[in-house]
Amino acid sequence: MGCNPPYLLSYRLRLLLLFTLCLTVLGWATSNYFVGAIQVIPRAKNFMATLHKVMYLGNEETLGHGAAMKKAELANCPSVSPNLRGQNKLVFKPDLTLEEVQAKNPKVSRGRYRPEECKALQRVAVLIPHRNREKHLIYLLEHLHPFLQRQQLDYGIYVIHQTGSKKFNRAKLLNVGYLEALKEENWDCFIFHDVDLVPENDFNLYTCGDQPKHLVVGRNSTGYRLRYSKYFGGVTALSREQFFKVNGFSNNYWGWGGEDDDLRLRVELHKMKISRPKPDVGKYTMIFHTRDKGNEVNGSRMKLLQQMSRVWKTDGLSSCSYRLLSVEHNPLYANITVDFWTAA
């Protein structure tokens, strides 16, 4: 009388088995979902890491794993370094050698330096056009390396040497420097630097901003006054994007003069405004020299300036042809030697 009928017990048993089976399937599906989700996260992280390496041209790999981890842990350097001294009295020893300068800069290797105490805010390439100015180069390197180190910059110095006896082409050498330097590092900022100008005040920051910068407000040879109101020569700073936007310098200025004004016109054409440091900061010493043979005044410079607005798109980085003879990494700088087989 008190027992359940056999068919009722069988029904309840089947229901219990079905419920247990559903729970098992649900648990298995949920487990696989979370395992799959966990596996996706490392793949996403790996993708972002790979993208970062591509953006920075594999720079972390060149440091090695330990150094890369150490760099990642560093805090950013301040916008104004605490190591700056301000106005510096420059001394040029007549018998100074490159080996002496090298001994004073043991942390510079292959022309490269980065601060150990913090992560630099910008990677800066200094481009120096050069021919037959070995003594000037030694003097500039002697003062420029500690100058840049006090500013806590991640920097590299490139000397672009024009071989042969054809007329000197400063602008084209700087285009070459830009193109070749980018093969080694995705530089943020480029400093286009004459070899005979040495900065006196390290508050004159060798960094790039939202607008192109002209760093030579005055020099000893002009009584520390600007040469003329729209002067844009000597030492200038443009970001990678700014220089690319204006298609770099013209390649057609053979001999002395005009190429800086051409670059200024390109900058103005693109609605960019040139900034300068304060006069007591943007001070330089020009090392005296006579005009070099092969760097005579360019008699065509005014005509070329008048053509700028018509030719800037086709005359510049996009048309810079040269024969690369060598790239040598000396302790204090990278030396890029090129030959220009045509001249105006």
Swiss-Prot record:
Galactose (Gal) transferase involved in the synthesis of terminal N-acetyllactosamine (LacNac) unit present on glycan chains of glycoproteins and glycosphingolipids. Catalyzes the transfer of Gal residue via a beta1->4 linkage from UDP-Gal to the non-reducing terminal N-acetyl glucosamine 6-O-sulfate (6-O-sulfoGlcNAc) in the linearly growing chain of both N- and O-linked keratan sulfate proteoglycans. Its EC number is 2.4.1.-, 2.4.1.275, 2.4.1.90. Its cofactor is Mn(2+). This is Beta-1,4-galactosyltransferase 4. The keyword Manganese applies. It comes from the Eukaryota. Keywords: Disulfide bond, Glycoprotein, Glycosyltransferase, Golgi apparatus, Lipid metabolism, Manganese, Membrane, Metal-binding, Secreted, Signal-anchor, Transferase, Transmembrane, Transmembrane helix. One of its GO terms (molecular function) is metal ion binding. The gene is B4galt4. PANTHER family: BETA-1,4-GALACTOSYLTRANSFERASE (PTHR19300), BETA-1,4-GALACTOSYLTRANSFERASE 4 (PTHR19300:SF9). N-acetyl-D-glucosamine binds at G258, E259, D260, D261, R301. It comes from Rattus norvegicus (Rat). Residues 1-12 are cytoplasmic. Residues 39-344 are lumenal. SUPFAM superfamilies: Nucleotide-diphospho-sugar transferases. GO terms for biological process: carbohydrate metabolic process; glycosylation; keratan sulfate proteoglycan biosynthetic process; lactosylceramide biosynthetic process; protein glycosylation. It is a single-pass type II membrane protein.
